[in-house]
Every structure is written in C-alpha cells, then in structure tokens.
C-alpha cells in the first residue's frame, strides 16, 4: 500500500499495559468490586427459570492461597450463588452460556463456524531508532498465494512486538532461527530485516486459533430475563483481522442504549442490536478467509463478487492513497463498506487496475 496519511490514529501499547490501565480505573470506582480466586460455574435463577438471579461461584486457589469469598462479598452470597440484578457474560471464546441456557431449559443458539487453523506466535525485541526508517510499525497481510502474515508494532519501553502467523496450522517455529526464517518467507522483507539483528527480549509465544465462531443469540425466541451475552462470548473473529476489541467497544454503546430502556427482555433486545454491529465485520472476516482455497465454506456469488472487487481495491491502493484511506477506514470499522463503492473511489479502483502492480500487501504506521 502506498505510503500516505491514512486519517486514522492508532494506540500502539502492550496488552498488559492496556489491561492494567483499564483494571486500575475500574477498581478506582467506589461502587465496583473485582472478585479474585473464584470462578463462575453456572447461572442462578428463579424456580421457573424465567429470570436469572445471579451466578454460581466456585473458589479457586492462587499463589497467595485461597481468598475467603464470603468476607469479600459482605452478605451478597447466598449458598454458592452471588445475587445480581443483571448478569452479563463477557467471558470470551470459552463462554459456557450455550450450555448454561440448556441447563435452564432454553435452546442453545445456532453456531456458525469457519475453520481456518490460524497458528501464530508473538515475540518482543529491542527497538532501535533506525528500524523501519523511524516508522511505528508495519502490517503484512496473508494472500492466497502466500497464506502467511506478519505485524511489527512499536510499544512502550522501547520495544517492538512482532507477531507472525499462518493459516492451516502453518505457524512459525518457537526457536529463534526458525522464527526469523519464517519472517523471511513473508512477501515483504521489512519484518525480517528488523528481527534478524534486533535483540530479542523473550521467547516466541505460540498460540492456535482453530476457527472463527458466531453464536446466533439474536435468533433465539426465548431467553431468561436479566441475562446478557457480550463480546467474544457471542462472536470471535480471526485475530489476523484485529476487529474483536473494536466490535466489543461498539457493543458497549449498544448495551448502554439498551439499559436506558430498562432491563425487560434485555438479553434478546441486546442480542438483536448487537447482531447488526457484528454483521459487517463478520462478513469481512468470513469473506476474506474464503479467498483461501483451503478454507471450507460456501462461496456464494456475493462472496465471489466482493472478493473480486477487493482484489482490485488492493491493487489500486498500491498506487493511490485515496483508495488506501478508504480501504483502511472500512477495515478498521470507522466507515461502512459502501465507502468503497462511492463513484470517486470506484473510479480510482478502475484506473488502478490498469496499472500492473506487484508486491506485498503492506501498511506502515508512521510517526505523528
């Protein structure tokens, strides 16, 4: 992608710092308590199971020993259940809400799954001023011809975070030489040029992501009152696209609006509105992954037409910054996909396809 101002601002910090700041601010609120050394093992409900009344807890252990749940809850614990006016499941991909609903006599939501077999590993390196000619990062996308990807981003403390990934279980090795060799197979050598000389600060941390999953809670005709499923507990996206946190933030705004209308049927109301938030990024992720021949799934006419047009968008963006800005806005969910079809952008895409361009699909994060 041609180097130009994208119009976007990115916060490039480590996950640990972000979680520390968020957790600290939440804990500073006088009416919020964070319970540790315990886990939720089920839902508590009325006798007829029509309303969720809390969660069932189980004590766990930490290196500091077992924390007395009864003391920390100060009377809110009834037996093994914590009473609540509203229960929100934000437990992520491992959510057990489908099973918990079944235990209360409700149907499980329909589950859509796209098997992709993404394997990736992240590693930190010492950052030097001359790396990437001073840019703050680079993203190298996977393509059907080379289903490997990489991202290198600046973080606090003078560090780079590098993530290398591949489809169909083809992830990077966990040894230093193998990790660097994997980076050398990417269609651009920018990441490899940095890590082959940079000082590593830790070992590669491998992770596997077998599939993108969407639970269709919006299709359920019945849900218990006072119960909401949220974020990755509804839908988990291929992490290569980096859309999970953006979708969760958008869902938080939807939840705020739903709560302003009260808690009656809050679960179903939120699920229906959240589905509209999820639809676009889900289509982007599923459609993008169906470009790879090894991914199983129905390639409808709509998917084939959209993917064909996006290939032309990528080609045009290599030489036209206006097309690049439009694509990045859609990919980062700050604009709707229709932005790529407005006459000015479409005309630029058509002109761009006349210019025979080869090379990696990359995007650089520059200093501001």
Give the residues covered by each predicted segment.
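Short beta-strand to alpha-helix junction loop
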Residues: 5-24, 35, 90, 96, ...
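FAD/FMN-dependent oxidoreductases across multiple families
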Residues: 170-254, 258-281
């Amino acid at each position: 992608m041609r180097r130009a101002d994208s119009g976007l601002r990115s916060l490039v910090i480590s996950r640990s710092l972000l979680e520390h700041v968020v957790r600290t601010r939440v804990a500073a609120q006088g009416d919020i308590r964070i319970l540790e050394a315990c886990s939720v093992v089920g839902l508590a409900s009325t006798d007829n199971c029509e309303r969720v009344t809390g969660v069932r807890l189980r004590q766990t252990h930490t290196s500091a020993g077992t924390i007395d749940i009864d003391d920390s809850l100060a009377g809110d614990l009834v037996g093994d259940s914590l009473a609540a006016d509203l229960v929100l499941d934000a437990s992520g991909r491992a959510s057990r809400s489908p099973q918990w609903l079944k235990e209360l006599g409700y149907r499980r939501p329909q589950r859509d799954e796209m098997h992709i077999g993404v394997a990736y590993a992240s590693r930190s390196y010492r950052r030097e001023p001359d790396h990437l000619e001073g840019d703050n990062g680079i993203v190298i996308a996977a393509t059907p011809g080379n289903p490997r990807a990489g991202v290198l981003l600046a973080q606090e403390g003078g560090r780079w975070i590098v993530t290398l990934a591949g489809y169909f279980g083809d992830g990077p090795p966990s040894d230093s030489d193998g990790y660097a060799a994997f980076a050398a197979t990417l269609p651009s050598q920018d990441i490899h040029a940095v890590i082959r000389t940079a000082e590593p600060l830790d070992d590669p941390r491998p992770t596997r992501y077998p599939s993108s999953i969407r639970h269709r809670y919006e299709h359920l005709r019945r849900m218990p009152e006072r119960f909401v499923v949220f974020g990755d507990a509804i839908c988990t996206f291929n992490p290569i696209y980096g859309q999970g946190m953006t979708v969760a933030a958008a869902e938080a705004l939807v939840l705020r609006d739903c709560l302003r209308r009260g808690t009656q049927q809050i679960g179903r109301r939120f699920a229906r509105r959240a589905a509209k938030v999820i639809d676009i990024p889900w289509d982007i992720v599923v459609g993008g992954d169906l470009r790879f021949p090894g991914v199983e799934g129905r390639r409808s006419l709509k998917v084939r037409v959209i993917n064909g047009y996006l290939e032309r968008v990528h080609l045009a963006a290599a030489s036209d910054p206006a097309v690049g800005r439009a694509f990045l806005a859609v990919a980062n969910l700050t604009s709707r996909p229709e932005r790529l079809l407005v006459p000015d952008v479409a005309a630029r895409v058509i002109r761009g396809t006349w210019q025979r361009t080869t090379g990696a699909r990359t995007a650089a994060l520059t200093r501001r």
